[in-house]
Amino acid sequence: MKRYATYAETRARFAWDIPARFNIARAICDRHEGTALITLDGHRVRETTYAALRAMACRLANTLLAHGVGPGDRVAILLPQMVETAAAHIAAYRIGAIALPMFPLFGPDAIAYRLTDSGARALITDPDGVAKLDGLDRPPLVLSVGPAPGALDFHGTIARASPDHTCADTAADDPAILMYTSGTTGQPKGVLQAHRIVLGMLPGVELPHDFLPAPGDRLWTPADWAWAGGLLDVLLPGLFHGVPVVAHRFRKFDPAEAAALMIRAGVRNAFLPPTALKMMRTAGISPVPLRSVGSGGERLGDALLDWGRGVFGVAINEFYGQTECNLTVGQCHSLFTPAPGSMGRAFPGFDVAVLDLDMRPVVEQAGEIAVRAPNPALMLRYWNNPAATARKLRPDAAGQVWCMTGDVGRMGEHGDIGFEGRDDDIISSAGYRIGPDEIEACILRHPSVAMVAVVGRPDAVRGEAVHAVIVPAPGVEPGAALAAAIQDYVKTSLSPHEYPRTVEFRDALPMTVTGKVRRRDLRLNL
């Protein structure tokens, strides 16, 4: 994107250029030479070139095709930040398949649901992931980066395939990525994104990173590549622009290790979720000079922003979006001064409004944040869920379709948008958007639980923390031991980032006359 003197001019002169035929793999891996990925191996900094990444991806693409995986099939990827993860994505895109990223810390229940709901034909994982498949219906093809029983060895298998592959001729609107996002009702929904998503993300990546790319830029985020923040906001746009991306796996985020990593790997541009920033501030890390820092997921607050400017030497640019239409609003302090307390303004190419109950745009009033369709960053649809798609993509009285975020905001007279809260039950914790239904379903499977409701409670570090209100089964004694057992059960069955950090026992839950739990009443009493 070209920089002009003002935000208004930059926005006015911007125009989308989306070709009819477009493939992510060709765009991010076939156009560049030099360093694509950087990993830290002990005390060594290792670089993977675009040529090496392309060869690995082509070998994997040919392997997938040889095993009957083809266009439109889902390829699940259950791996941490590593070279093989990027190659797996590129291979899926190359053959016209749909990449299905999954969080490496997912437990068997979460993995089983996503594999079954998507109908995945292949799974690329590691020994940790293979171990979680016991008792589950496996995809026909399982490749493991490292030896694991019942799985083909990733490197040994693809070594027998050709490093040459002709990329599929896909349309920009052909499906490419299936990411599951939390919702308030039912199981997580699969968000189906097209190949054009990479182009749609560029304005929201370039502005917060002060018009990336610039000479010497190098990107990193602790956000896993299974999430929109890691995959869509860092890995894919970084590779698209030829900017090296640092890959590193944290078993558990460590602020001192993160600061040391950024210095050792020469990071110049970082996406740091709010929780990571808060932990770094609490740890009192030494200064880490960066060219740009972006953050999103929850409000940062003046104290954290002031600290960040002092430690990183630049203003932190906040941004906002959802998996369904990511990076729509944000900041670029070198281009304009955001209104105090706001998330920023609509990025060039995005028409964002705050709508009242009649879906009419309002200014200086609270309403629902919405993004005008069509837009290249907008999802195609929810996977096999037309009813949810219809609720998300709704026409106003004039027939104009909007992507309804479910978030309440307020727009100022100059276009700055402030976030005021959510109008649903989504829990925003440490940068994750967590829906209560999946957690409640997991807890209800515990034999000691009769009823459960999950809500978010305020948390100084995470923004919100998962809180479970439980009615024990008859004859079960509530207490600390039961609470700990339920917490461990969710950690191992679902995911460590979704377990209830606090558990409360009650004799009954507040209910509506139609038998629904009144979560709002529970939140008000926290």
Residue ranges and their predicted role:
Residues 346-349, 360-393, 434:
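Conserved ATP/PPi-binding loop(s) of AMP-dependent carboxylate-activating enzymes
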Residues 35, 149, 161-182, 187, ...:
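Conserved pre-ATP/AMP-binding loop-to-beta segment of ANL
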